[in-house]
Each structure stands twice: as structure tokens, then as C-alpha cells.
Curated annotation (Swiss-Prot):
High-level lineage: Archaea, Methanobacteriati, Methanobacteriota, Thermococci, Thermococcales
GO cellular component: ribonucleoprotein complex; ribosome
Stretches the record annotates as Disordered: 41-72
UniProt-listed HAMAP family: Ribosomal_eL34
Family statement drawn from the similarity comment of this UniProt entry: Belongs to the eukaryotic ribosomal protein eL34 family.
Gene Ontology MF term list: structural constituent of ribosome
Keyword set, alphabetical order: Ribonucleoprotein, Ribosomal protein
The protein's name in its UniProt record: Large ribosomal subunit protein eL34
Lineage: superkingdom: Archaea
Gene name of the record: rpl34e
Alphabetical GO biological process terms: translation
Secretion signal, residue range per the UniProt entry: none
PROSITE patterns in the cross-refs: RIBOSOMAL_L34E
Keyword Ribonucleoprotein applies: yes
Length: 88
């Protein structure tokens, strides 16, 4: 095993080869789930993936198509209500 693969920053994936042997493939771990910028709740609609995996996705799969996609829906509603009330 290579020295760099001894650390736990690499995920171990056990793969059965056609010859019947079980070998270990090393993969980088997935990043943490995206969180709301205000309350810190996990965001839905944003995939977990390394940058090279996300690069292959279309733009609509990378983030929600609504105003303020970095906020959860409840925080977004709260801000939009405050903005609407401030303009009156």
C-alpha cells in the first residue's frame, strides 16, 4: 500500500475483480452537504460531490432555481417578506 493511501482521507472501496480476487480501490471522500448561510440547516437540491464530478452536471442540477439558492426556503421567505415590507 502506498504511504499516501494509509491515511483515512482516502475512502477504501472493496472491488471484486473478474478473476475472483478482492482488491481495494482508493477514492477521495465526498465533501459535506451544503448548509444554509443563515441558520445552518442542510440544503436540499444541491448534490454532494467533488468539483470534478460536479463539473459534469448541468447547471440546473448544481443548485436550486429560485432566488437566494444559498439559503433554505424558510430563511429565503423571511428575507423576501422583510424586503417587501421595507419597500411599502
Amino acid at each position: 500500500m502506498k504511504t499516501m493511501h494509509r491515511s483515512r482521507s482516502w475512502r477504501r472501496k472493496y472491488v471484486r475483480t473478474p478473476g475472483g480476487r478482492t482488491v481495494i480501490h482508493f477514492e477521495r471522500k465526498k465533501p459535506k452537504v451544503a448548509h444554509c448561510a443563515m441558520c445552518g440547516r442542510p440544503l436540499n437540491g444541491i448534490p454532494r460531490g467533488r468539483p470534478n464530478e460536479l463539473r459534469k452536471l448541468p447547471k440546473t442540477k448544481k443548485r436550486p432555481e429560485r432566488p437566494m439558492p444559498n439559503l433554505c426556503p424558510s430563511c429565503m421567505r423571511r428575507i423576501m417578506k422583510a424586503q417587501a415590507r421595507a419597500t411599502l
